[in-house]
Amino acid sequence: MLMKIKTSIHPSSVVEEGAQIGEGVRIGPFCHISADAVIGDGVELVSHVSVMGATTIGASTKVYPMATLGAPPQNTKHKGGRTTLVIGANCTIREGVTMHVGTDTSRGETTVGDNGNFLAYAHIAHDCVVGKNATFANGATLGGHCEIGDNVYIGGLSAVHQFVRVGDNAFLGGCSAFVGDVIPYAIAVGNRASLRGLNIIGLKRAGLPRSEIYLLRKAYRTIFDRSRTVGENIEFAKAEFASSPTAMKIIDFISSRGKRHYAVPSLKGGDGDDTDDED
C-alpha cells in the first residue's frame, strides 16, 4: 500500500488563514502564502517564495527561491479588483521568476499551462495565456495580453511585446525583440524579430511525418511568396493545402488576425533551419 506524503510547512513560513494547501505539499523556509491561494498536491516551494493574491498552483509544480507569483499587474488601468493567476501542473519555476495576475479591465486572469519550464528571472505579465510544455529561458519576458501556444521555446533575454501571439511549436531566439505575431512552427530571431524558416528539428522531435514536413515547407513558401500579397497567398494556400492539418494551422493563425502585424521572413531566411530547440 502506498503511503501518502504528509504536507510539511517550515515554521518560518507564513500561510494566511483561508489558503488551500493540498496533500504532500512542501513549503520551505521564509515563504508567504496568501489567503486566496490554492496550492495543489505535491507542490514544493523551496524557500523565499511569495504566492500572492488569488493564485492557483497545479499539482507537482516546483518553485525555487525568490519567485513571486500572483503579484498585482503592472498596469495603471487596473482598479484593484479580484483577478487571478492559474499555473498548471508539473511546472518548474526557477529563481526570481515573476508571474502577475490579470487585470480587472481585461480578461482578469493570467493562465500558464502544464509542464512549463520557466528559467531564472523569466516574467509573465498580466492577462497572458501560455500553453502547455512552454520553455522560457533565463530572462525571457512577456508583456501583457500575450498568447503563447503549446510547445513554444523563448530564448534567454528576449522580450515579447504586449498583445503578440505566438503559435504552437514556435522557436523564438535569444536576445530578440518580438513586436509581431509569430506563426506556428516558425523560428524567429532578431531586433525586431523576423522569421528564419521553420523549426524543422522541433517538428521531427515531435514526430511529425516527413510527408507533412514537406507540405509545411511548401506552404511556408507559398504564404510568403513576395510576388503576391499575403492575403492573396492565403486564399491560394487554403485551397492548395486543405488536406494538411499543420499547414492549415498556419493559415488559420494568420486568418484570425490579432492586434499586431505578423513577423515575416528575413531576406536571409529559408524554409527550414537546423537550429536546435533546447537550451
UniProtKB/Swiss-Prot annotation:
InterPro entries hit by this protein: Acetyltransf_C (IPR029098), Acetyltransf_C_sf (IPR037157), Hexapep (IPR001451), Lipid_A_LpxA (IPR010137), Trimer_LpxA-like_sf (IPR011004)
Enzyme category, top tier: transferase
Listed pathway(s): Glycolipid biosynthesis; lipid IV(A) biosynthesis; lipid IV(A) from (3R)-3-hydroxytetradecanoyl-[acyl-carrier-protein] and UDP-N-acetyl-alpha-D-glucosamine: step 1/6
Location(s) in or outside the cell: Cytoplasm
GO annotation terms (biological process): lipid A biosynthetic process
Cellular component, GO annotation: cytoplasm; membrane
UniProt entry keywords in alphabetical sequence: Acyltransferase, Cytoplasm, Lipid A biosynthesis, Lipid biosynthesis, Lipid metabolism, Repeat, Transferase
One Pfam family from the record: Acetyltransf_11
Function description: Involved in the biosynthesis of lipid A, a phosphorylated glycolipid that anchors the lipopolysaccharide to the outer membrane of the cell.
UniProt name for this protein: Acyl-[acyl-carrier-protein]--UDP-N-acetylglucosamine O-acyltransferase
Organism for this UniProt entry: Mesorhizobium japonicum (strain LMG 29417 / CECT 9101 / MAFF 303099) (Mesorhizobium loti (strain MAFF 303099))
Encoding gene, per UniProt annotation: lpxA
